[in-house]
Swiss-Prot record:
Name of the protein: DNA-directed RNA polymerase subunit beta'
Function in brief: DNA-dependent RNA polymerase catalyzes the transcription of DNA into RNA using the four ribonucleoside triphosphates as substrates.
Binding site for Zn(2+) 2: 883, 961, 968, 971
Catalytic activity: RNA(n) + a ribonucleoside 5'-triphosphate = RNA(n+1) + diphosphate
Binding site for Zn(2+) 1: 60, 62, 75, 78
Molecular functions per Gene Ontology: DNA binding; DNA-directed RNA polymerase activity; magnesium ion binding; zinc ion binding
Keywords: DNA-directed RNA polymerase, Magnesium, Metal-binding, Nucleotidyltransferase, Transcription, Transferase, Zinc
Gene3D superfamilies per the UniProt record, alphabetical: 1.10.132.30, 1.10.150.390, 1.10.1790.20, 1.10.40.90, 2.40.40.20, 2.40.50.100, RNA polymerase II, clamp domain (4.10.860.120), RNA polymerase Rpb1, domain 3 (1.10.274.100)
Source species: Salinispora tropica (strain ATCC BAA-916 / DSM 44818 / JCM 13857 / NBRC 105044 / CNB-440)
Cofactor note: Binds 1 Mg(2+) ion per subunit. Binds 2 Zn(2+) ions per subunit.
EC numbers, comma separated: 2.7.7.6
Length: 1297
């Protein structure tokens, strides 16, 4: 069997009949499967043991040889080899076909490869293959030319003979007619009878004439056809073809069906064909040139590879191993079988019948019909339903063919190769574990015992609790008390992986140290819920056990939850106290004047706590406390900065005006952090955790988070926050406010009834009035709510809910939308607290229902987007530390603020310029170097740069990276999830795809309607992101100026025309058919620059690429994607979007091939294109000319160099067809390819750089090893606890088969 680690690339090609026979272990001759009485396979049938191997290990069919000692013997009685039964998964058979058939993929695929090769239309090809028409395969033109005169004379003689016989016959008949008429006259017959006889005679003479004429015409047609006979010519008339064959059989050959196609392919001279096509491309125009290009691709594919085009016509069909198309007995004695067996059976039946008919010498028409049926049977086996109606099984279900086995989500690629099930795993419901540390999880005892069973068994034997593995297994199954102690020992320091589906980003799988718990539910630390997007309303999670030492080390170092605090999308902490913890910390740090003990002073925090315990001091009372070990005091955002008293040094005792609660809060923060002396809400807490993440090690951060969690839960209980009906306070002046606006609305209605305004204007006015009313009522509610109101506390602290929700509950529901998404101009005046009227309730249900439908659609769409993004970026891996490029991109660091124009940090600096590498030294106004080239940009450096008055800097970017494969570390910059320089081997492409796809479900699906005809609808949310990444031409696209010039606008009846008169005096450029509704951005007489938008709308990225080049498109696309995400408040770093855009712009269309091998019009990888051109220029050749192309992510994924990756993505059959013809080789660079064939992925620790590490002992270590005194006692390490792995065969796991 092949070992995956021994090959570096995987090639796919066309198999010839010899290849198929070579793979085969025997010919399948009978359609039988298994004998219904003995249940043993029939000889020569589809399950034959002689061909495919024995059904039982080491046992032949007849039972003569049993046991392993006869290994390799072939039984002389039944012919079965004595071997393992698993060979039935590997050994193939074949069916020798009585007539050739074509492979449906190459004839029916789009484009038809056979059609392109033979230059035949697919319609004609179908007629030939399915025996509806004859085709001429070859013509001996020389012989025809030589003998044409003789042949023509022969035909002429035949025609004359035919004319003579016609004339003589007519003469004879005319004589007979005259005699008959004379006889009748003599008999005195009536005129009527005479007339009838005369007419009859004339009719017969006419028939003779016609028959003779037809004969002459046919001779003319035969001669004419023969003169013009060409190879590949179709002859649809069967009689004509037979006549041709009978008369001129030695001058041409022809036929129908796959045999004829085979003959045509054999007669082809590929080199000559390629040369003539190249000539056509050089000289041709229009459609001819395009067709020649397409044909040349196919012809060149066969020329440049070892593939023979004869592989597209099959003489024998391979039969896949029987264990891959099993047949199993059901309870009722019936059998369930794979559809493939039915399809193979049809092929064998028809093939055998055809053989018999040929042997009997049946008429051609019967044989041809059987051949057609055989062709259809093979088609159905390869790709059922591709042509005509699919073959159906019982219950009219189409049978699953070989192609269907590969295609789609349930196909081989996605179901079994990319999505395997694994052992050592389990799943259960999750509950909260508030007492756990950040890196721990609670694992139910029963589950842990099952998962760690082999480890427990080995340890029981090591500790002599059991004599052997078998008795250890029995002990575990009976759950003896000692087993639990051993389990406790085994799971210590052994991390497990927890995963919650859907795993939208890498934080969906994290490692934890298991703690044994009673019950059957897994316990989860409350802070990791955000990362998993988990809640405890019945969610389930899966547990996986990393087995090997390497896997455990990776889980502990890379995946432990306390090492995954930062989110890969933006580098912000994701383990953040939420909900009740925030309420607790808010309660703890809130300051309430007038509380018990206000104004007192305490000599230490311990004294203050004592006063609190004795009930003399309130947690929130403002007091003075003398604190030790402070490094400074933080007064909070918006407050006066704290100034230290004179002479105070860090660490000296100091009296601070604060509250006891704040002192307790600061105890959870690490020593060395400034004293936090302000109220903590969600935003402030987030800023503190951010700051801690940047300045303190992970260990300190994890401990702090645990402290915050403990404090949060504890004080949330103390705060006693509850909600009752009376806490929902309605605004006192609501009636009065609504009454006032009601009058306004009546006034508008009256004006409308008098005809003073249109319905559209009335609608707009009403919406405006009621929006104002809603806002005023909401404002009134805000002012009326007391600070102590629990709802206000929840919202103000950021724990849960927002003012909009409170407004709907307590004040007024407001305006809602109808099912079309337009706003209804009458508001719902009630709040939920008061209750809605029937009509109000009815119109408010539209929005709710639409919301639910939206969410369902959005989830599917978002998942599909992620899948496409992963596919396009999966091979972007950090391959080297620095590619050494000088190219960089400029980025804004600062922006002008206010009237004075002082420079402040740019609002989007965190998601654009942070975590990147500087490309140049940055100098201040006085010429001093503020930051050196190659420095990592963080918030401290950004502040320094902005303080030096620098507004924009040049930074390295993946868009300008020059690495041959993947990208380099310097261009990528800092790794966001670790906060350190990115490691070689990091799969940054997949991280980028996950970061963009994961928030996809939060984006809206809506295209916003303001109702009526208020301009074009703008696509937003998820559909807009898809539109950008698929590089589609946007809806309502705006034209952009091709050249700088003056604008002239011409109004037509229905549309406008914008004309740009270029500055350089070249021809005017017109943009016509611009709707009158669209707002213009350039007026008559304005001057526009190149690439400037002329109307309101979205720019077409392809136009932008053509006019302004790749750099402009990159900036435009990044901004467009960011706009959508920012509008929803989602932060994603630019670098993730840039990686996807880099993949979209990876290819070049060849315009002129120069002296390269590239064909014009083909898409080529940019790196390959540039290196090939450099090589040619250095050798003095002519380089190729190309144009950059922007490809959508689906197209880019399918155009990838790896055929395995493309085939497992979409359009499997098309990708495989194409790859086979080009004999594509997959060099296994990306991740998917390696997962498919079962190798370690070339990313992370699987990259070759780390796989080939050699450990050299130091001199010191060598000295220790070689002197026996280095050992405390001589132990050769063969004892029971030597740490050696016990071979798995020794464990009796029961059968897994």
């Amino acid at each position: 069997m092949l070992d995956v680690n021994f090959f570096d690339e995987l090639r796919i090609g066309l198999a010839t009949a010899d290849d198929i026979r070579q793979w085969s272990h025997g010919e399948v001759k009978k359609p039988e499967t298994i004998n219904y009485r003995t249940l043993k396979p029939e000889k020569d049938g589809l399950f034959c043991e002689k061909i495919f191997g024995p059904q039982r290990d080491w046992e032949c069919y007849c039972g003569k040889y049993k046991r392993v000692r006869f290994k390799g013997i072939i039984c002389e009685r039944c012919g079965v080899e004595v071997t393992r039964s698993k060979v039935r998964r590997e050994r193939m058979g074949h069916i020798e076909l009585a007539a050739s058939v074509t492979h449906i993929w190459y004839f029916k695929g789009v484009p038809s490869r056979l059609g392109y090769l033979l230059d035949l239309a697919p319609k004609d090809l179908e007629k030939i293959i399915y025996f509806a028409s004859y085709v001429v395969t070859s013509v001996d033109a020389e012989a025809r030319h030589r003998d044409l005169a003789t042949i023509e004379n022969e035909i002429l003689a035949e025609k004359r003979q035919s004319e003579n016989s016609r004339d003589s016959e007519i003469e004879k008949r005319a004589g007979k007619l005259e005699a008959d008429l004379a006889e009748l006259e003599a008999e005195g017959a009536k005129a009527d009878v005479r007339r009838k006889v005369k007419e009859g005679g004339e009719r017969e003479m006419r028939q003779i004439r016609d028959r003779a004429q037809r004969e002459i015409d046919r001779l003319d047609e035969v001669l004419d056809t023969f003169r013009k006979l060409e190879p590949k010519q179709l002859v649809t008339d069967e009689l004509l073809y037979r006549e041709l064959r009978d008369r001129f059989g030695e001058y041409f050959t022809g036929g129908m069906g796959a045999e004829a196609i085979k003959a045509l392919v054999q007669n082809m001279d590929l080199d000559a064909e390629a040369e003539s096509l190249r000539e056509t491309i050089r000289t041709g125009k229009g459609q001819r040139k395009i067709r020649a290009l397409k044909r040349l691709k196919v012809v060149a594919a066969f020329l440049n590879t070892s593939n023979s085009p004869l592989g597209m016509v099959l003489d024998c069909v391979p039969v896949i191993p029987p264990d891959l198309r099993p047949m199993v007995q059901l309870d009722g004695g019936r059998f369930a079988t794979s559809d493939l067996n039915d399809l193979y059976r049809r092929v064998i039946n028809r093939n055998n019948r055809l053989k018999r008919l040929i042997d009997l010498g049946a008429p051609e028409i019967i044989v041809n019909n059987e051949k057609r049926m055989l062709q259809e049977a093979v088609d159905a086996l390869f790709d059922n339903g591709r042509r005509g109606r699919p073959v159906t099984g019982p219950g009219n279900r189409p049978l699953k063919s070989l192609s269907d086995m590969l295609k789609g989500k349930q196909g081989r690629f996605r179901q079994n190769l990319l999505g395997k099930r694994v052992d050592y795993s389990g799943r259960s419901v999750i509950v909260v574990g508030p007492k756990l540390k950040l890196h721990q999880c609670g694992l139910p005892k029963q589950m842990a015992l099952e998962l760690f069973k082999p480890f427990v068994m080995k340890r029981l034997v090591d500790l002599n609790h059991a004599q052997n593995i078998k008795s250890a297994k029995r002990m575990v199954e009976r759950q003896r008390p000692v087993v639990w102690d051993v389990l406790e020992e085994v799971i210590g320091e052994h991390p497990v992986l927890l995963n919650r589906a859907p795993t939208l980003h890498r934080l969906g799988i994290q490692a934890f140290e298991p703690q044994l718990v009673e019950g059957k539910a897994i316990q989860i630390h409350p802070l990791v819920c955000t990362a998993f997007n988990a809640d405890f309303d019945g969610d389930q999670m899966a547990v996986h056990v990393p087995l090997s030492a390497e896997a455990q080390a990776e889980a502990r170092i890379l995946m432990l939850s306390s090492n995954n605090i930062l989110k890969p999308a933006d580098g912000k902490p994701v383990t953040m106290p939420t909900q009740d913890m925030i309420i607790g910390l808010y309660h703890l740090t809130h300051r309430t004047p007038g509380e018990r003990g206000e104004g007192r002073a305490f000599s230490s925090d311990a004294e203050a706590r004592m006063a609190f315990d004795n009930g003399e001091l309130h947690l929130q009372a403002p007091v003075k406390i003398r604190l030790r070990g402070l490094v400074g005091v933080e007064s909070g955002p918006g407050a006066e900065p704290w100034t230290a008293p004179e002479g105070w040094v860090e660490g000296d005792p100091i009296t601070v005006e604060t509250t006891l609660g704040r002192v307790l809060f600061n105890e959870t923060l690490p020593p060395g952090y400034r004293f936090v002396n302000y109220e903590i809400r969600k935003g402030q807490l987030s800023a503190i955790v951010n700051d801690l993440a940047e300045r303190f090690p992970k260990v300190a951060l994890a401990a702090t988070l645990d402290g915050l969690k403990e404090a949060g839960f504890h004080w949330a209980t103390w705060s006693g926050v509850t909600i009752g009906m009376e806490d929902v306070l309605a605004p006192p002046r609501k009636r009065e406010i609504l009454g006032r606006y009601e009058k306004e609305a009546d006034r508008i209605d009256k004006q409308y009834q008098r005809g003073l305004m249109t319905a559209e204007e009335r609608r707009g006015e009403l919406i405006e009035i009621w929006t104002k009313a809603t806002n005023e009522v909401a404002k009134e509610m805000d002012t009326a709510l007391p600070q102590e109101n629990p709802l206000w506390k929840m919202i103000n602290s950021g724990a849960r809910g927002n003012l909009l929700q409170l407004r709907q509950i307590a004040a007024i529901r407001g305006l809602v939308a109808n099912p079309k998404g337009e706003i209804i101009p009458r508001p719902i005046k009630a709040s939920y607290r008061e209750g809605l009227s029937v009509l109000e309730y009815f119109i408010s249900t539209h929005g709710a229902r639409k919301g639910l439908a939206d969410t369902a659609l959005r989830t599917a769409d978002s998942g599909y987007l992620t899948r496409r993004l992963v596919d396009v970026s999966q091979d972007v891996i950090i391959r080297e530390e620095d590619c050494g490029t000088d190219r960089a991109i400029p980025m804004q660091v600062g922006q002008q603020a206010g009237e004075a124009g002082s420079l402040v940090v740019h609002e989007h600096a965190e998601t654009s310029v942070h975590a990147r590498t500087l490309a140049d030294d940055i100098k201040g106004p006085d010429g001093t170097v503020v930051a050196e080239r190659g420095a990592d940009i963080n918030s401290i450096l950004v502040d320094k740069i902005v303080a030096a008055g620098v507004e924009s800097v040049r930074v390295r970017s993946v868009l300008t990276c020059e690495s041959k494969l993947g990208v380099c570390g310097a261009c990528y910059g800092r790794s966001l999830p670790t906060g350190k320089t990115v490691d070689v081997g990091e799969a940054v492409g997949i991280i980028a795809a996950q970061s963009i796809g994961e928030p996809g479900t939060q984006l809206t699906m809506r295209t916003f309607h303001t109702g009526g005809v208020a301009g074009e609808d703008i696509t937003q949310g998820l559909p807009r992101v898809q539109e950008i990444f698929e590089a589609r031409i946007p809806k309502g696209k705006a034209p952009i100026a091709d050249t700088p010039g003056r604008v002239r606008i011409e109004d037509g009846e229905r549309s406008r025309k914008i004309i740009v008169v270029p500055d350089d005096g070249s021809d005017e450029i017109a943009y016509d058919k611009i709707s009158k509704r669209v707002r213009l951005l350039a007026n008559d007489g304005d001057h526009v620059e190149v690439g400037e938008r002329l109307t309101v709308g979205t720019i077409d990225p392809h136009e932008l690429l053509r006019i302004l080049g790749p750099r402009a498109v990159q900036v435009h696309l990044t901004q467009e994607v960011q706009e959508v995400y920012r509008s929803q408040g989602v932060l994603i770093h630019d670098k993730h979007i840039e990686i996807i855009i880099r993949q979209m712009l990876k290819r070049v269309t060849v315009i002129d091939s120069g002296s390269t091998e590239f064909l014009p019009g083909v898409l080529v990888d940019r790196a390959l294109f540039e290196s090939e051109n450099r090589r040619l220029v250095s050798e003095g050749g002519e380089p190729a000319a190309g144009r950059p192309v922007l490809m959508g992510i689906t197209k880019a994924s399918l155009a990838t160099d790896s055929w395995l990756s493309a085939a497992s993505f979409q359009e499997t059959t098309r990708v495989l067809t194409d790859a086979a013809i080009h004999a594509r080789s997959d060099s296994l660079i990306g991740l998917k390819e390696n997962v498919i064939i079962g190798k370690l992925i070339p990313a992370g620790t699987g990259i070759s750089k780390y796989r080939n590490v050699r450990v050299e002992p130091t001199e010191e270590a060598k000295a220790k090893v070689y002197s026996m005194t280095g050992y405390p006692e001589t132990d050769y390490g063969f004892g029971p606890a030597s740490g050696q792995a016990v071979p798995l065969d020794d464990f009796d796991f029961g059968s897994y088969r």
